[in-house]
């Protein structure tokens, strides 16, 4: 992958890539311009586009930029935590920086309504919508994967969501005829890596070690391990 945010560079780079992951984490006026130019180029080439609306709801600039991107570009996938996705769906919301607001969390108690919400937003946005958290939801508007892989400790490592967005872009690009399943598989793989990584932690290990354990688990994971370890149902 190449991470480019120079407006004069992004069209050339986008042309040689199979997919584009637009992550608004490091937002500024130059990167906003680059995002739109790269997105327009990717759309013209029929490439996979993924939007990661990092921190949408935390500031007016982030919210407005994410909404504008969603309205002007034909995203294949939109991935975020529940607060970020609610911000896009409703046009406003609240997050705690890059973290979801506790009151928004998907749980067994509100699962039915959360699934209905994600399906509705996927239909309206014409995109696969992936909501990640303690319980992950991935929907194309018709079906919804409810995924239960992962560890709560993953939430203490900054960047796991961004890492997942990169993986998801690659999974969807590699499986053009099964995009929903590919997006769900990426979520399962990331969560499973968190489980495997945590099982290999030793006394005295901390976040830095855990981050690397997750990366190692992803690197060493194959299809058989993913099939065996994935925890999901389809609604």
Whereabouts are the PLM-identified features?
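Glycine/small-residue-rich loop that forms an oxyanion/phosphate-binding "nest" at active or ligand-binding sites
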Residues: 31-80
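Short, well-structured alpha-helical segments that form the helix of a local strand-helix-strand
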Residues: 117-122, 179-194, 211-215
